[in-house]
Amino acid sequence: MAIVSSVPLASKSCLHKSLISSIHKLKPFCRTIPTLGMSRPGKSVMPSMSMSSPVSDDGVQRRTGGYHSNLWNDDIIQFLSTPYGEPAYRERGERLIDEVKNMFNSISMEDVEFSPLNDLIQRLWIVDSVERLGIDRHFKNEIKSTLDYVYSYWTQKGIGCGIESVVPDLNSTALGLRTLRLHGYPVSAEVLKHFQNQNGQFACSPSETEGEMRSIVNLYRASLIAFPGEKVMEEAEIFSTKYLKEALQKIPVSSLSREIGDVLEQDWHTNLPRLEARNYIDVFGQDTKDTKLYMKTEKLLELAKLEFNIFQSLQKTELDSLLRWWKDSGFHHITFSRHLHVEYYTLASCIAFEPQHSRFRLGFAKACHVITILDDMYDVFGTIDELELFTAQIKRWDPSATDCLPKYMKRMYMILYDMVNEMSREAETAQGRDTLNYARQAWEDFIDSYMQEAKWIATGYLPTFDEYFENGKVSSGHRVAALQPILTMDIPFPHDILKEVDFPSKLNDLASAILRLRGDTRCYKADRARGEEASCISCYMKDNPGATEEDALSHINAVINDVIKGLNWELLNPNSSVPISSKKHVFDVSRALHYGYKYRDGYSVSNIETKSLVMRTLLESVPF
């Protein structure tokens, strides 16, 4: 339990000044922010964790993590038996795609549903709908044309419902701000000021009509895509959060109330697109009374359901391949660690569910699973002498280097060796160049940082915050979780682009920082009970004598909010020379890994929310 104290919060100037000063600038950061990434997927928050040191089969005293057993076995494949791989379903899907394209292309003033007084909001509605339903990949050209049209009418005061609307409209402007910003259009959040009164409150009536509530929903969604220094976005988030939470207490249970609940739950930086699509399918269009609009929502909904279920037939094939890799690699002999390959595959499927990204999904699942095993090996199971030997032999990158290693390390060495080499061959096919040495260096740096932390544990040394933070940038695992999987995609990453998304780019730094900071807030108590004293919390308290755990947590949570805005800027900066499409997958890796810490340490306690995610997005089909 955090210690409650009346000691004032330590000044932000006491800690990583460059981070704080940079975060509050709207423009791109001028200084490199010291970062820390993911508190390696899986540090436990289970208070019942065993910290004993049993004698292992080799007679060595070893610590244990006390993790629960693997939740999934080969029987999971049986749950993925689905008829939706049949050609008839795919053919129906193709027909629906054509019909939805016609919906985009038929938007004109000749359509009686559209007029110069509502055409802008109608166009935005269609784009927003296909994106939230997870079917937007089929309509890239149509979305681009639609948003170009909307942007051509964008003003400093926002937009109205239609091109001839006299007064700007909050719903249209908020939805337009969010959607245009996410697609790289240079739109300023200052437009929202025109909807505030003198007290900073956003214009709304006390009646709380459905239309007004939907306006505030879109205001809230827009506020999450804030850049550093945008005070109006902070005000919009505070106002809309309060408004929607109060509205939920008053309105009856309906698809609107469920949508509001889902939106409040779906934090932008832990939002998984496939999970969002699954949830939105349940509420989309249910309250539609207009006949023609109902027909449109029905087509969109049917396509979304088909797409969701058809993808599961591909997931069955991929998961079967992953389970064979796990078994053939001998992971079942590694009993000291967590086994989360199914969970990591689920996360990968939630951020990249386009069929062509199979290598990314499998590569991400494998890399993250190996990271987890290495984490437990360095933090808990290995002796300091064994770990130093393993670290040195990794640099040789030669199977003969395993001759001097303990049996369990021989297996891990060859698993890592084979995995990195395999993904390098896949990356060479995709990128047209050899990236093995690049990947090897990333893994060597990562393992060196683990070794540093193992030494801290062995000696009981508590580093300064900056010392801990610098090493943690590498030990986060974010870089090695993202690097090789994205290189296997059919997206070109020439050297000049790669250096803007990989280490030492700000995008990589900030993505790592948010995971380290959030991970430490979820895991520090269990880590400390296990003998791992160093964390963002303990190092902050060391640097700021008199600060309590509550002070440290409050400060770190504030920093996390600022880092999120910086990460938004790095992804969406309209003046960047790097396309959003090239940066998005690194950003999405951050979202996926961050999701594991949304409620607790979901990598060690994976039998609650993480298990639910597997069930809802991987194993359960959408009913028709």
Swiss-Prot record:
EC number(s) from the headed UniProt entry: 4.2.3.52
Major location (coarse): plastid
Residues annotated as transmembrane: none
Cofactor detail note: Binds 3 Mg(2+) or Mn(2+) ions per subunit.
GO molecular function: lyase activity; magnesium ion binding; terpene synthase activity
GO biological process, one term: green leaf volatile biosynthetic process
Free-text domain note: The Asp-Asp-Xaa-Xaa-Asp/Glu (DDXXD/E) motif is important for the catalytic activity, presumably through binding to Mg(2+).
Binding site for Mg(2+) 1: 375, 379
Feature: compositional bias, Low complexity: 44-56
Name this protein carries in UniProt: (-)-beta-phellandrene synthase 4, chloroplastic
Gene Ontology cellular component list: chloroplast
SUPFAM superfamilies, sorted: Terpenoid cyclases/Protein prenyltransferases, Terpenoid synthases
Protein family (similarity comment): Belongs to the terpene synthase family. Tpsd subfamily.
Ligand binding (Mg(2+) 3): 527
Pfam annotation, one family: Terpene_synth_C
Region of interest (Disordered), ranges: 41-60
Pathway recorded for this protein: Terpene metabolism; oleoresin biosynthesis
Amino acids binding Mg(2+) 2: 375, 379
Protein's organism: Picea sitchensis (Sitka spruce)
